[in-house]
Design a protein with these regions (language model features):
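Conserved glycine-rich beta-strand-loop-beta hairpin in the small C-terminal domain of fold type I
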Residues: 343-353, 365-378
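Short Gly/Ser/Thr- and Asp/Glu-enriched loop/turn motifs at secondary-structure junctions
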Residues: 34, 140-141, 368-372
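Conserved core segment of the aminotransferase class I/II
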Residues: 97, 274-343
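N-terminal small-domain helix-loop-helix segment of the aminotransferase-like
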Residues: 57-149, 156, 330, 398, ...
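Hydrophobic residues in well-ordered beta-strands that form the structural core
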Residues: 170, 191, 250-252, 325, ...
């Protein structure tokens, strides 16, 4: 029993429970109702995906139509949503958020709208600044601008540091939202190879900044979408130094930063910012309130420019949702929610990885992120993830093919899976079906 384990080890019951939960989340043990914990069967792990081409230049970005089609499929409740970009909605504290929204609605006055114009709700910005401070970072509330989700943060940041026609360094593969933003703002992408484990190739980035007049670098430092990569601390330092020496702004997309599986949150590159040239963007959409669409940017020396750009576009972020989030963060047990969320995501990622290892051909490579909720898979280069996408969709399963995350025809043998959903027979069968389809593609040659 847990109590006996604690006595033998000289540990408290709470410490033993937390240790067992960690082992379960990592797939080492399984819990059986009214029976206890057992050592889990560990299938042979699959190899990790490889790094793509080091440096790719795209003068034009145009992928919107295809992304729209893929995302539309994920809205169908009869489709297994492995291709979705959104976390399982059942993971979030909806009743508490609803009560907070109801409470602030009763207090809402016409003055509230004026008081919450950019840079946004004062209480919410103070709370975000406090969370930065707790992680060892000094970010003033005046530097923080509340936005309509992370995408607005990122778009405003791009507009603040670039002009149409400028070159922007991005990851390859990249979050398709970045590609869409570059297309909309008529910017040129310089795609830098990114490894599923340790992130952007800094040698390739250095080559790029020497070869092109790059004005900004946009990347995810933690649990990158789609690969799940996290930039090691030494690489963050090298990245910040490289960009600072060339006066290149860094737009740090950190929407998955709170979804870590380790003991401590990895520090953003923003923690190393000495000149205010790093714009740190994040959101509550992936960790608390997907439907609220509230994000922020700690914009450094660009804070006033970002505020002006927001006033000229969306004017402000939804005021009731800002107020509700500020109320929830003060009273709602946010950190307790985050601990539960991380534990569940770690368990679900482990369950999906084990199912893949059991059912997929051994030639398939799969990432092993330390957080977030995406897995990146690599097929034999001769196989097409687009064809797999079409065949899977005809059988009620969505995936996100690699083409979504590139400006060209790269990563056509790769795809992304969403691992945030509670594992059950439906998802296990979907993995089995994908395995059969992959074998069918290989047999067809």
């Amino acid at each position: 029993s847990l109590r006996e384990s604690g006595k033998r080890a000289g540990l408290s019951l709470m410490t033993v429970v937390q240790s067992y939960q960690l082992l379960e989340s990592q797939g080492w043990i399984v819990a059986r109702p009214q029976s206890g914990y057992y050592v889990a069967a560990r299938p042979q792990p699959l190899p990790q995906p490889s790094r793509g081409e080091k440096l790719l230049l795209s003068e034009q970005v145009d992928i919107n139509a295809f992304i729209f089609d893929v995302l539309q499929a994920c809205k169908d409740p009869d489709i297994v949503p492995f291709g979705s970009a959104f976390p399982d909605a059942t993971l979030f504290a909806q009743p508490k958020l609803a009560r907070a929204l109801s409470s602030v609605a009763r207090k809402f006055t016409p003055h509230s709208s004026l008081a919450n114009l950019p840079p946004g709700n004062d209480a919410l910005r103070r709370h975000i600044a406090q969370r930065y401070a707790l992680s060892g970072m000094q970010v003033a509330p005046d530097e923080i601008v509340i936005t309509a989700g992370a995408m607005e943060s990122l778009s405003l940041s791009l507009q603040a540091v670039t002009q149409p026609g400028d070159y922007v360094a991005i990851e390859s593969p990249a979050f398709y939202g970045a590609l869409q933003a570059l297309e909309r703002l008529r910017l040129k992408a310089v795609a830098i190879a990114t490894h599923p484990q340790d992130g952007i190739d800094l040698d390739a980035l250095q080559q790029a900044v020497e070869q092109y007049p790059i004005k900004a670098c946009w990347l995810m430092t933690h649990f990158q979408n789609p690969q799940g990569a996290t930039l090691p601390e030494a690489n963050k330092q090298r990245l910040v130094t490289l960009l600072r020496d060339r006066q290149i702004s860094l737009i740090e997309d950190d929407v998955y930063g709170e979804l870590y599986f380790s003991a401590e949150r990895p520090l953003p590159a923003k923690a190393l910012d000495s000149g205010g040239q790093i714009l740190h963007c994040s959101s509550f959409s992936k960790c608390l309130a997907p439907g609220f669409r509230v994000g922020w940017v700690a914009a450094g020396r660009y804070a006033q420019q970002v505020q002006r750009l927001q006033l000229m576009s969306t004017v402000s972020t939804s005021v009731p949702t800002q107020m509700a989030l500020a109320d929830y963060l003060l009273h709602g047990g946010y950190d307790t929610h985050l601990r539960r969320l991380r534990r569940l995501l770690a368990q679900r990622q482990s369950a999906m990885r084990q199912a893949i290892a059991h059912h997929f051909p051994p030639t398939v490579k799969v990432s092993q992120p330390d957080g977030g909720y995406f897995l990146w898979l690599e097929l034999d280069p001769a196989l097409s993830s687009m064809e797999l996408y079409r065949r899977a969709l005809s059988r009620g399963i969505s995936i996100a093919p690699g083409r979504m995350f590139t400006t060209g025809d790269h990563f056509n043998h790769c795809f992304r899976l969403n691992a945030s959903f509670e594992w059950n027979d439906r998802f296990e069968e979907a993995i089995k079906t994908l395995a059969k389809l992959i074998r069918g593609l290989a047999a067809a040659g």
